[in-house]
């Protein structure tokens, strides 16, 4: 892959130069208090920002947060992120009240060497996500005018054809940040020749969300362990009753075909935790996966399945995990995710956690992040990379 890196930029002397860093600071906020509930994505960009600060660059950070509708919305402001980023960097971060307006221009103009500014949410401007190339390009022109060089360190957004990811690199000297480089190296290992046995664990709610990655991975993996809400569509494809559990009827035939083609590679739950309702305090017990009672809803994999999955993971040399095994946000239905995560952490293997809900689960369940070889910051981006798709943000860096 022909991509210039942050080290290439640093070698050119960046003291006093304005460097625009596209970060992925799309962190979860508590709906009541507005407090950041998981700062993993902020921490992930620190190596790149720290190197630029150390080198005396004027660092201008930009990011999106949530899905505002192309206009300012206080619920999606990056202001709390500026505060947390400053704490982690050990120096105040200057916050611009807009993205490319008067506040952004004056904030950037006022930066001293080695200082950091954070622009307001990119998605407050309709040009960021516009399908119209002219509108997107006009916004990219304004963003690029704030800087002399561009660093993409937002792996979680490289699968988006957005102005800050795809169009700005065409307007400035551009490089990949430390995080993007590490992500591409790790995922390249998984798509190349991973050490065997290679075991993939997939969870999450929908088969339809994971179908393309299952199709891409099946020929490459030795075992594919399926949990989460998506397992019920596979169980239905085997002819089992799934009660009121999450089911994609239109995917049953597809799952049947996958099971036939997999030749025994796909491992499904043998027991599940079924509840009377989708609620944290609902009465629940463990039932056989091949006969979930009607009106009961499966919300986690059962202990026998956890033990079986753990046994399959024990001898693996490469493991990729994407998607929780159950509704881990409810304590009663977090045991499956926790048990499988611990088995992955304890495996003598190269272990990759594929972003999104899985990364959130590792932190929410208090597991040691250092126990995994790599925790990706890109849920959708990591899956699309494994599917073999061209990622717009990576393509823009290669140009």
UniProtKB/Swiss-Prot annotation:
Q: Which residues form a coiled coil?
A: none
Which reactions does this protein catalyse? Answer: (2R)-3-phosphoglycerate + ATP = (2R)-3-phospho-glyceroyl phosphate + ADP
Q: Which UniProt keywords apply?
A: ATP-binding, Cytoplasm, Glycolysis, Kinase, Nucleotide-binding, Transferase
**One GO MF term:** ADP binding
| UniProt KW Protein transport keyword | no
Which biological processes are named by the entry's GO terms? gluconeogenesis; glycolytic process
Highest rank taxon of the organism:
Bacteria
Return the GO cellular component terms, semicolon-separated: cytosol
Q: What is this protein called?
A: Phosphoglycerate kinase
Lineage runs: Bacteria, Bacillati, Actinomycetota, Actinomycetes, Micromonosporales
């Amino acid at each position: 892959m022909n991509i210039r890196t942050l080290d290439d930029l640093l070698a050119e002397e960046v003291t006093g130069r304005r460097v625009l860093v596209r970060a992925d600071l799309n962190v979860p906020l508590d709906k009541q208090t507005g407090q950041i509930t998981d700062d993993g994505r902020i921490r992930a960009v620190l190596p790149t920002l720290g190197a630029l600060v150390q080198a005396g660059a004027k660092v201008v950070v930009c990011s999106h947060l949530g899905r505002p509708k192309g206009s300012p919305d206080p619920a999606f402001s990056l202001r709390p992120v500026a505060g947390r980023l400053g704490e982690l960097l050990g120096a105040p971060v200057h916050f611009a009240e807009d993205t490319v307006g008067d506040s952004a221009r004056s904030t950037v103009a006022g930066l001293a060497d080695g200082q950091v500014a954070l622009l307001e949410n990119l998605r407050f401007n309709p040009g960021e996500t516009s399908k119209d190339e002219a509108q997107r390009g006009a916004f990219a022109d304004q963003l690029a005018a704030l800087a002399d060089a561009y660093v993409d360190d937002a792996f979680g957004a490289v699968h988006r054809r957005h102005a800050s990811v795809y169009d700005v690199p065409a307007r400035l000297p551009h490089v990949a940040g430390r995080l993007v480089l590490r992500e591409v190296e790790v995922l390249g290992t998984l798509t190349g020749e991973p050490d065997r046995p290679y075991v993939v664990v997939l969870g999450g709610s929908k088969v339809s969300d994971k179908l393309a990655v299952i199709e891409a991975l099946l020929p490459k993996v030795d075992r594919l362990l399926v949990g989460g809400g998506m397992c019920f569509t596979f169980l239905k494809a085997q002819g089992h009753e799934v009660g009121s559990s999450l089911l994609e009827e239109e995917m049953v035939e597809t799952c049947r075909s996958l099971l036939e083609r997999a030749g025994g590679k796909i491992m499904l739950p043998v027991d599940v935790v079924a509840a009377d309702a989708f609620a944290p305090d609902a009465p629940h017990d463990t039932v056989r996966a091949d006969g979930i009672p009607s009106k009961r809803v499966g919300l986690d994999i059962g202990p026998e399945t956890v033990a079986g999955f753990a046994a399959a993971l024990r001898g693996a040399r490469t493991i990729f995990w994407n998607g929780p095994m159950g509704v881990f946000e409810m304590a009663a239905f977090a045991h499956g995710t926790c048990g499988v995560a611990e088995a992955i952490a304890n495996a003598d293997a190269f272990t990759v956690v594929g972003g999104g809900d899985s990364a959130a689960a590792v932190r929410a369940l208090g597991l040691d992040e250092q126990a995994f070889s790599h925790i990706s910051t890109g849920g959708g981006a990591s899956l699309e990379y494994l599917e073999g798709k061209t990622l717009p943000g990576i393509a823009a860096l290669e140009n």
